[in-house]
Amino acid sequence: NVEFAVKYMYYLLTDEQLDEMSSGNEAKKFAKLLAYWKPRDPTPNTPYNEAMAEYFRRIDYAFFNFQTIRERDGSKTERGKIYVLYGPPDSIESSLANGTTTETWKYSKLNKTFIFSIVSNGIYKLMEIQ
């Protein structure tokens, strides 16, 4: 579904770019979507675009796995955003200290660590990036 695909490009595009990609009929939107992903395709001589497939696989995973009571679309949560942009972390550590649940996501190759804490009703907030 082209509408769905374009809608979920919000982490990669500016508002202006998203508006532009959203304009036109379905065929034009599809052409714009493919044009965006073509230079990002790691194997441009094949019909399958691995980068595009991976991005939407992450959106799908985040949608279902990071839902909260307040946000049914888990890709829009803070953990969902990090997952969509960086993929699955190399390690996840959960801890409970002083009544606060913390989840630490480590990305070794990127040398990045994201620390989330539950702030209320199971909602994780990004507290720190190292």
Annotate each PLM feature.
Residues 1-130:
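Residues within mature, well-folded domains
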